């Protein structure tokens, strides 16, 4: 029996609550199987006082979205002096802001797509760049609010400026990159491997592709040339280190090989709180690298810390 008491933080109150509940349950169950004493904490506004009373040895952060992966919960854990998994305050905040993260990784030679930040109301009547392009909320995950504007589309999508839009007023407009969706997991200072995501019946890796059964297929390891495979691993590790991530992260890429095998590789974003069910991408990539789900989570618990 392992002696550590682990508080698994799950749920929360962001739009990604259902995803977090799924990740948190899987992690809590697996950690119990590994011999840890586990308490499941469905996070509310009183989480600070709950954790202060609970006094766990480690907090396993299974939250997703604002509050859970933007540096907020990380700051609370730092204040309480509770070691926690995944990235720290600054790296979490930077990674959650897609535009700022892109600026940082670009300085270390990671290729990114042309983009600009705009107010959503300012792009209602005129294209902010020549289509095709993608509109993304600056601070959301799980592909919430992502809109693809196709080549030849005469007007910007009206939903972005409407009352239906629930993802903040600031959006990132990014050049659309044709090609295959690839992702690479990083564990500590090692890139674990590259997986291809093949959406089923979807134009890109949206919410349903990620979380609805049969929404996508995963090709692990990705069937690309050894040079491209190594390049993506190198870029993912560079992004992880440049943003200041710790523990586990996952970088997403587009790979356009329509005209040559070497093609164009473009980094899209780094996820500091990737999905953590046994069938999620990071555990799947880790399994191909020889790490079981339980072993991966145990490593994360032992890697947990404050102030780094």
Curated annotation (Swiss-Prot):
Residues annotated for Mg(2+) 2 binding in this entry: 269, 271
Per the record, the domain of life is Bacteria
Leading EC class: ligase
Q: Which residues form the ATP-grasp domain?
A: 102-302
Q: What is its EC number?
A: 6.3.2.4
Instruction: Supply the Pfam families for this chain.
Output: Dala_Dala_lig_C, Dala_Dala_lig_N
The record's principal subcellular location, in a coarse class, is cytoplasm
Q: How is the cofactor bound?
A: Binds 2 magnesium or manganese ions per subunit.
Task: Identify the cofactor(s).
Answer: Mg(2+); Mn(2+)
Binding of ATP occurs at 128-183
Swiss-Prot/TrEMBL GO biological process terms? cell wall organization; peptidoglycan biosynthetic process; regulation of cell shape
The residues that hold Mg(2+) 1 are: 252, 269
Cellular compartments annotated = Cytoplasm
Q: Name one GO cellular component term.
A: cytoplasm
Query: Pathway it belongs to?
Result: Cell wall biogenesis; peptidoglycan biosynthesis
Q: PANTHER family given for it?
A: D-ALANINE--D-ALANINE LIGASE, D-ALANINE--D-ALANINE LIGASE B
Function description = Cell wall formation.
This one is known as D-alanine--D-alanine ligase B
